[in-house]
């Protein structure tokens, strides 16, 4: 009798559907690879400055630290910027259009958020000494990216 219980257990472990179901329970759900959109930047121009009012929301949608995204925009636009944590706004010391900000945010997403292997946005940006690595939570791929 004990032999038949072991045989049933062994057969269950070899069943493809059972193993697949067990695997899906262990793998975290992914956001998907469909077209993912970040919030449209709410821009106000004050003199020679540009204020992105919903910058914190944009950074949260990108799943990245707002200071990191701010540093990227600062570098790409070759200007000084300050992030106000209390209000969640980014102040750029240059006049820039919504279209240009959107283009740089899309480029940031392509380079530092979206997995180049599977297209998922379920990624983490890891810093290893002086290098940055983009690690995908969906497929497990690791890709070096240029430092910000």
Curated annotation (Swiss-Prot):
Keywords: Initiation factor, Protein biosynthesis. The keyword Protein biosynthesis applies. SMART domains: eIF2B_5. InterPro entries: IF2/IF5, TIF2_bsu_arc, Transl_init_fac_IF2/IF5_dom, Transl_init_fac_IF2/IF5_N, Transl_init_fac_IF2/IF5_Zn-bd. The keyword Protein biosynthesis applies. It holds the Pfam family eIF-5_eIF-2B. GO terms for molecular function: translation initiation factor activity. PANTHER family: EUKARYOTIC TRANSLATION INITIATION FACTOR, EUKARYOTIC TRANSLATION INITIATION FACTOR 2 SUBUNIT 2. eIF-2 functions in the early steps of protein synthesis by forming a ternary complex with GTP and initiator tRNA. Belongs to the eIF-2-beta/eIF-5 family. HAMAP family: eIF_2_beta. Heterotrimer composed of an alpha, a beta and a gamma chain. This is Translation initiation factor 2 subunit beta. It comes from Aeropyrum pernix (strain ATCC 700893 / DSM 11879 / JCM 9820 / NBRC 100138 / K1).
């Amino acid at each position: 009798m004990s032999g038949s219980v072991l045989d049933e257990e062994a057969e269950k472990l070899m069943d493809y559907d059972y193993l697949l179901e067990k695997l899906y329970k262990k793998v975290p759900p992914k956001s998907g690879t469909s077209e993912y959109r970040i919030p449209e930047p709410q821009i106000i121009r004050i003199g020679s400055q540009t204020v992105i009012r919903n910058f914190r929301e944009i950074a949260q949608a990108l799943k990245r630290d707002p200071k990191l995204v701010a540093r990227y925009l600062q570098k790409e636009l070759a200007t000084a910027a300050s992030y106000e944590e209390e209000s969640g706004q980014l102040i750029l010391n240059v006049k820039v259009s919504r279209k240009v900000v959107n283009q740089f945010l899309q480029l940031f997403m392509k380079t530092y958020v979206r997995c180049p292997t599977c297209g998922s946005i379920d990624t983490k940006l890891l810093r290893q000494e002086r290098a940055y690595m983009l690690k995908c939570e969906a497929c497990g791929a690791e890709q070096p990216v240029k430092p910000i």
